[in-house]
Amino acid sequence: KLPFFVWSDINKKITEHYLRAAGITLEQKKAINIFLLDANQRVLDIKTGLERSLPASILKFYGELSPQQEPMLMSVNAPVLLMPNLLDPPMCEELITLWKEGEHEESKVTSVVGDKEVTRKHTKVKKRRDFRIMDPGLQKVLQQTIGRRIAPELEKVFHFGGFRFDRFVVVCYDSERGDYFRVHRDNLSPSTADRAFALTLNLNVEEYTGGELVFPEYGPHKYQPKSGGGIVFSCSLLHEALPVTQGRRFALLTFFRTLNNQQK
């Protein structure tokens, strides 16, 4: 028994959609044989050619994937969306390098003090260093890469569509500095009120300990997507980034804003 389903697309209707989304040319189409999908029908790999070893290579590919978790009985869970493979390892490394070689700064918080909105350093609440991505070319690549992978899920899971990206920020939580972000919400000031969902995309999970996200309104559970994977959640949820206890945690952050206001 195969550990996965096999579908035959005789009329090539489904294949055409995948080819178009992947940007594959007409010349390349002739060599395409098999699309390898995950449980959510996202393309993991494309196998080409007619070699005899193709079936064996497919079995090997699926066998080397991270093992599926055993079913767990869930009684309490935060209403969040965990998504793997939003960015590939080279892009994760590129973003970390940008932070290391670029001009990063102490992160600030935006809040309402009295009747005024104030943006300031507030180390009792947040302590980390940020690098804001200003390169239009890289912004476009991230928007297209992440957007096409995450937009269908936002629509399917939360019935949320028609968003626009906020800025992209590469952040670093350093254990030697004792970095953290205390419990907070992401949409409590006038300039952040149209933030609908937040995305935290981990870049180097294998290189640090700690730094998980928690959502205290929904139990003590800790959330940590693998490198290249992200977690999406409503900006109205109370959440916290726990201190990194060893190493440095790098992550890419952005928000999905509604379309009823201009970009802040």
Where are these regions (language model features)?
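Structural recognition of the beta-strand scaffold that forms the well-ordered cores
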Residues: V6, I231-V232
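Fe(II)/2-oxoglutarate oxygenase catalytic core
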Residues: A39, A56-A198, N202-G230, S236-K264
